[in-house]
Amino acid sequence: MTTTVSEEAVLTKPIPAFYCCYLLRSAKRPSALYIGSTPDPARRLEQHNGFAKGGAKRTERNTLRPWEMVAIVEGFPSRTGALQFEWSWQHVHTTRHIGAVETDQLNRKRKNPPTDKGSGIWTSTPKVLGNLHQLLRSTYFGTWPLTVRFLSSEAHNHWQRWIERADGLLPDTIRVKLDFRAEGASVLDSNLPANDMTHIDATYGGIQEHLAKSTSLLGDNTNSLSCEVCQQQLSTQTEIIVVCSHRRCHAVFHVNCISQLFLEDEGSSGLVPILGECPACRQEVTWVELMKELSMRLHGGKNATKLLKGERKDKANTQGTKSSKGGKKPAKTGDYTLDGDYEDLDEDWMNAVNVEPSSEDGDRNAANVKGSTGRVEIVIDDSEEDGFD
């Protein structure tokens, strides 16, 4: 099966190294919750707690700090997808996706508003997690290869209790991961959460070896490669080639061949597979990791070159950042990031774009800018949206 570069429909820029929607909880007042999104949970948590610039105004109050992340939803293939999910999670009373979920009861008029009128702070962990469960079961988001990572045993217990009374189960595309860490405030500094989220790799370091292997393999064997699925010879100049992500496996495929194989193995009628077994090494491979390396190889440009050379680009706070109380955070080591990866939006970005996807729209659609006749892609890193209608 042949797929020419001119017919490419993979991406026009590298898939983000990491992007998640998160649920914050106040360590001082556990009933206070906040929903947001970010490509860097550790940095974003510093912002919310006043140790770095850019935190949301709704989380500035010292009576609520420190904030801790108790759950994140990860695996989004683009920033736009994460923003669509964040908006729907924040606006469950208006999003069209909840209505498609069986018969679970949801108060869409929200008789129980946030703690303070207009504060944007939620007050019920079970309700917020219940809303999340319904979104993940919706026709639209239920087809995405997302993972819900719980960092709090208490939050996971609320989740489990919701599941016991919910009408339906999560689709097979959705995974749940337990990653319990110390909760509440740090015993060393009450202004810091016990879990600072630095254990999560939000960089491209995870694909460096895969990218190096693919670049070498495709560069050295331009006339001797054949697709592991259809057995036809591959052209590195005219075809989109996918390489197995496992270290010792050198299997290569037409992107359409391996996609179709994975879909058949899944018994799926969808367009995009979730994961599958490499026909050569017989190990499990996720579609997202294949596409992340492919998109970096095809569209990374100088950033892909940096990654291959192992060059590290330090973040702005490498030398340490002062806290709102005059303290200083330890310096961080460099990360594998891309130029332009951390362009923050204004706090009212949601007022300028429409991120609610229609039932016909896929993640390929960019957000529609108000007052514009064309479509532009949202290029952002952190959600600065504070309010919930």
Swiss-Prot record:
GO BP terms, alphabetized: double-strand break repair via homologous recombination
Record-listed E.C. numbers: 3.1.-.-
GO molecular function: 5'-flap endonuclease activity; crossover junction DNA endonuclease activity; zinc ion binding
Cofactor: a divalent metal cation
Chief place of localization: nucleus
Zn finger (SLX1-type) start-end: 227-281
Domain GIY-YIG, residue spans: 17-99
Keywords associated with the record: DNA damage, DNA recombination, DNA repair, Endonuclease, Hydrolase, Metal-binding, Nuclease, Nucleus, Zinc, Zinc-finger
GO CC annotation, single: Slx1-Slx4 complex
Membrane spanning stretches: none
Pfam families, sorted: GIY-YIG, SLX1_C
Subcellular location: Nucleus
Enzyme class: hydrolase
Disordered, as annotated region: 303-389
Listed Acidic residues bias regions: 338-349, 379-389
PROSITE patterns for this protein: GIY_YIG
Function: Catalytic subunit of the slx1-slx4 structure-specific endonuclease that resolves DNA secondary structures generated during DNA repair and recombination. Has endonuclease activity towards branched DNA substrates, introducing single-strand cuts in duplex DNA close to junctions with ss-DNA.
Record-stated family: Belongs to the SLX1 family.
Self-association and partners: Forms a heterodimer with slx4.
Protein name as catalogued: Structure-specific endonuclease subunit slx1
Record organism: Talaromyces stipitatus (strain ATCC 10500 / CBS 375.48 / QM 6759 / NRRL 1006)
